[in-house]
Structures are given as structure tokens and as C-alpha cells.
From Swiss-Prot:
SUPFAM superfamilies: Aspartate/glutamate racemase (SSF53681). InterPro entries: Asp/Glu/hydantoin_racemase, Asp/Glu_race, Asp/Glu_racemase_AS_1, Asp/Glu_racemase_AS_2, Glu_race. It is an enzyme of class 5 (isomerase). Substrate binds at D7, S8, Y39, G40, N71, T72, T179, H180. Signal peptide: none annotated. Gene3D superfamilies: 3.40.50.1860. This is Glutamate racemase. It comes from the Bacteria. Provides the (R)-glutamate required for cell wall biosynthesis. Belongs to the aspartate/glutamate racemases family. Pathway: Cell wall biogenesis; peptidoglycan biosynthesis. The keyword Nucleotide-binding does not apply.
Length: 254
């Protein structure tokens, strides 16, 4: 079985890692749209267009199932992708919401994400339907920090404090509403001591169990639309192994 995964950049490899750990025999093709990262500052129309282009690229690679490992694309494009493509399509928002509701004792839940994800209200609406009190905030500097490989040290620490100071004492659970954010999880946990920090990558992998046959050769192909300065370092950091990335321009519709 072959699974396709796409994200706006390198952060979606956190989902890729969780899926490979859960289903080690499946073949996986990953696409990071690093030439156009971040999606979180784009209009809905642009996010949908980029998402369809990424999905088409993976369709041409012969995938049997698609995971949208980008919260912004999940918020704005998931339903259109489900309608347009002939294979099952999964996002990362619903699994993260379910995991947060399971872990929270007070139902006072925080959500952080890109500007577009927070503006969409996708997390807030799903949590409020379950009776949660929701606190949300956009953290637009987190993705550039991760893409630059700046995940530890004084700069990310100060940025985390700047964005998350209003959550202290208000929430018992925080959803990382962007697949880049788990790379900053240590700094976030250090600042919000005692708060459940929800990384939806593992929850997303679990949500596939009724649809994935753990069959194949366990192969992995990594495609990116641009070779960013820290790409190889991020691959090693997230996946724990060195995998040669392939750079492609086939995604773009000219």
C-alpha cells in the first residue's frame, strides 16, 4: 500500500514519522511545498489551489490514500479534496480535537496555529460543539523558526513566551494546530508547565487504522519544491535518519 502525505513545508514530516512507526511496511511518498511555505498567510482560494496541486502530484505517484499533514490545508481544502480525488483523504484537525478532549480534565483548551488556521475557526467550532471553553491564538513566527532550524535557544524561547503568556493558568490542554509546532514542543512544555500539549501526528496515524493495510516494502520518497538551507538537517532531526530529498517543480501549474 502507498500513502501520500503533503504539507506546506518540512513540518508535516512529524506526521510522516508517526505513520511510518505505526505502519512500517507501507510505502510512503511525502511532498513538502517548501517553495510556497507558509500557507498560513495565504487566502482561502490560494490555499485550496496549492492543496489541489500537491494532491495531483501525489495522485500521479500512484498513492492509495492521502494525508493532508497541514492544518491550514485541512481547514480550508479537505472537503474539496475528498470530493475531487478517488482515494480516501484524511486531515489532521479532527484527530487532534479528539485527543485534546480525551486528555483535558477541565475542558479549558487552547489552540495555536497559523493565522489562516485560527481564522478558519475549524478547531474552535469542533471543540465548542463538545462543550469546551476555547482559547485560540495565531503564532505566525513559529513556522519560519522551524523552517530555519531554530528550535532551541534564546530566540525560540522568547517567541514562545511572547505568544503563549496569555494561556498560563487558563488552560489544562493545548493543541499544536500546525504540524511544524511539535519541533518547538520542548520550549512550549517548559513554558506551560503541567499543561497537556497535544501533537496531532500520532492521533492522525491512529485514525488511519481501519483504512491502512500494513503491506509494502516500507519505501520512502521525499519530495520538496525547493531546497531550503536547513532541509537536510530538518529531515535528520524529525525522522532520525538521513534521507536524500528530491527537488521537484512538477507541482506547479503554470
Amino acid at each position: 500500500m502507498k500513502i501520500g502525505i503533503f504539507d506546506s513545508g518540512a513540518g508535516g514530516m512529524t506526521v510522516l514519522k508517526a505513520i511510518r512507526e505505526a505502519y512500517p511496511n507501507v510505502d510512503v511518498v511525502y511532498l513538502g511545498d517548501t517553495a510556497r511555505v507558509p500557507y498560513g498567510i495565504r487566502s482561502k482560494e490560494t490555499i485550496v489551489r496549492y492543496s489541489k496541486e500537491c494532491a495531483n502530484f501525489l495522485k500521479d505517484k500512484g498513492v492509495d490514500l492521502l494525508v493532508v499533514a497541514c492544518n491550514t490545508a485541512s481547514a480550508y481544502a479537505l472537503e474539496e479534496l475528498k470530493r475531487e480525488f478517488p482515494f480516501p483523504v484524511f486531515g489532521v484537525i479532527e484527530p487532534g480535537v479528539k485527543e485534546a478532549l480525551r486528555k483535558s480534565k477541565t475542558k479549558r483548551i487552547g489552540v495555536i496555529g497559523t493565522q489562516a488556521t485560527i481564522k478558519s475557526g475549524a478547531y474552535q467550532e469542533a471543540l465548542k460543539r463538545a462543550g469546551a471553553e476555547v482559547y485560540s491564538k495565531a503564532c505566525p513566527l513559529f513556522v519560519p523558526l522551524v523552517e530555519e532550524g531554530m528550535i532551541e535557544g534564546e530566540i525560540p524561547k522568547k517567541v514562545v513566551e511572547h505568544y503563549l503568556k496569555d494561556f498560563k493558568g487558563k488552560v489544562d490542554t493545548l493543541i499544536l494546530g500546525c504540524t511544524h509546532y511539535p519541533l518547538l514542543k520542548r520550549e512550549i512544555q517548559n513554558f506551560l508547565e503541567g499543561v497537556n500539549v497535544i501533537d496531532s501526528s500520532r492521533a492522525t496515524a491512529k485514525s488511519l487504522k481501519d483504512f491502512v493495510k500494513n503491506e509494502g516494502s516500507g519505501s520512502l520518497e521525499l519530495y520538496f519544491t525547493d531546497r531550503s538551507q536547513n532541509l537536510e538537517r530538518l529531515i535528520k532531526l524529525i525522522l532520525g535518519e538521513e534521507v536524500e530529498p528530491k527537488i521537484t517543480s512538477e507541482v506547479f501549474v503554470l
